Swiss-Prot record:
This is Transcription factor E2FA. Residues 1-69, 114-159 are annotated as: Disordered. GO terms for molecular function: DNA binding; protein dimerization activity; RNA polymerase II cis-regulatory region sequence-specific DNA binding. Residues 12-26 have a biased composition (Pro residues). It comes from Arabidopsis thaliana. Keywords: Activator, Cell cycle, Coiled coil, Cytoplasm, DNA-binding, Nucleus, Repressor, Transcription, Transcription regulation.
Amino acid sequence: MSGVVRSSPGSSQPPPPPPHHPPSSPVPVTSTPVIPPIRRHLAFASTKPPFHPSDDYHRFNPSSLSNNNDRSFVHGCGVVDREEDAVVVRSPSRKRKATMDMVVAPSNNGFTSSGFTNIPSSPCQTPRKGGRVNIKSKAKGNKSTPQTPISTNAGSPITLTPSGSCRYDSSLGLLTKKFVNLIKQAKDGMLDLNKAAETLEVQKRRIYDITNVLEGIDLIEKPFKNRILWKGVDACPGDEDADVSVLQLQAEIENLALEEQALDNQIRQTEERLRDLSENEKNQKWLFVTEEDIKSLPGFQNQTLIAVKAPHGTTLEVPDPDEAADHPQRRYRIILRSTMGPIDVYLVSEFEGKFEDTNGSGAAPPACLPIASSSGSTGHHDIEALTVDNPETAIVSHDHPHPQPGDTSDLNYLQEQVGGMLKITPSDVENDESDYWLLSNAEISMTDIWKTDSGIDWDYGIADVSTPPPGMGEIAPTAVDSTPR
């Protein structure tokens, strides 16, 4: 269509009807155009909402249409007949009713729905084709705020209440805090679980979950059924001094943390100084300690000190001396094992204490011992000899109730004097053959095992059997086993 005819702002009145002439009389000729009767057509159903009520009809003045006879008017919601005198807008009333019901929907309590309150109702605004989609989008935008029911009482103030509880409100952590606060408010720290469940408005199984955890970490105890007692700070959380004690403990923890940090700094500085000292080639000749340096340490005063030089991974075992049930006397042993290399053992210092015998008299220890005996041992206790049987194992295995200076050859070990310290060297006998009491090798005789000096005369009289030669070593009588194998 070529154009749109607009109505004048003045009042629009219908034109006067044309004069009716009888068919026999001739039609007078006038200067004004003849307006034909209005042809009514059925309007097509429109999918767009109407701009105005369907019962209203707008008609234009003939004067405004005198120069626009061939134009037509198109409206978004109706169909316009191509007339020369008027434009009629029609829209189906059923469509308008359905649309208006959708736009304005009164709620049950007399208020309009919050999702449709912002929809314009002015007839001058044209809704889009996707008007229903816009309504959904606005309703979706308002979904973030909870819709609360509005009271019908107009005089009461409108209050907003949450539609649902938060997840944190029902969490076990928050419930535990509330439960501990109840214990603090309880008298003498005693709380009834039934009353706690009623106060907190939770099930008892939730209370039991909390009490099981607190009882597991030793904060509460159950002296009676369904009653708990606090065992935390000051044994009673209801005291007023509990908060003060907690603050004191926190301050003490901070002070200890500062002291620990200072000690860590000192350790780090000392390690750096030792590293610089050891890595410097000029200081290699000073990298040693003497026996006096070791004995002068405060922790080694009045102690028997045995130094062990062993590779990394060496294990040291000291069995209980009372576990040797097959031996009548207590046995003190030190067992060293290593698979990475040889083990060196030194007797650095020997404690010169008094040893008490069975009669209670004090006597000084022998002048020369294979190794130092345990401090405070009696005459019935064994003085052990530490031997290194092979580069992998060092075992204290020999019993010597009454040691003498000449008995070192009978124990099959060698000792070297190194710079004032006594070094214990490995034995010639292998580890598997060190237990000579149970040795069953037929090639080794008893004479070879108990070898002494070659000048000893074994052919002496029968009467002299009870008196051994003066050069022969003493043998423990309980150690001989004459049972043939």
